[in-house]
């Protein structure tokens, strides 16, 4: 019997999880998905995600893959069954078959994140927004964001002491836009992201918006390739992974 590979498209509210990756000291999205698959397929099944979201970070679209040996699966039935087995804060959109060597992480050509900030206290979105108390200069923040396109080494925005072999990333989009009277969104797209990178960039851009750093200071922080020079990471609760893109040829 042949081994087939499948992609799972899912969303989750990361509030009560210790991130995507399995952790020894807390429940993770990956663990929940593997348990649900093991129950449905009646055997332990490894799941590989397109990336590793940190504790408290959400995804409106994450992609993961798993392998199955046997008769081809009914993908609609798999999605339906997983949704019954998974907690209320994890949802599967669809399952699709891909080529045997397709990889959720290594074949992704682009990933997009959004970070939400708000200027008002509102009880119903507090776990998905970062509340800002002082005025921000979004024009300056966007000027600083534009400088990201001129660099590829983002060591200054990377979590220290990780197992990552390279800090090189290609940023394709980075911009603050106003969603409504009280909400601003930072959208960033790159071929790959480092651990904690988006939150570190947002935290440093907020320092520009507050007038504590100039656009030139922001540029110098990137050039220094030193995490200690950048701003404090923004909280994870306002960050969403919103898209992962793949070349069409990996799908069957």
Swiss-Prot record:
CDD domains: PseudoU_synth_EcTruA. GO terms for biological process: tRNA pseudouridine synthesis. Keywords: Isomerase, tRNA processing. GO terms for molecular function: RNA binding; tRNA pseudouridine(38-40) synthase activity. It catalyses: uridine(38/39/40) in tRNA = pseudouridine(38/39/40) in tRNA. Its EC number is 5.4.99.12. The active site is at residue 54. The keyword Isomerase applies. Substrate binds at residue 113. Formation of pseudouridine at positions 38, 39 and 40 in the anticodon stem and loop of transfer RNAs. Homodimer. Belongs to the tRNA pseudouridine synthase TruA family. This is tRNA pseudouridine synthase A. The gene is truA.
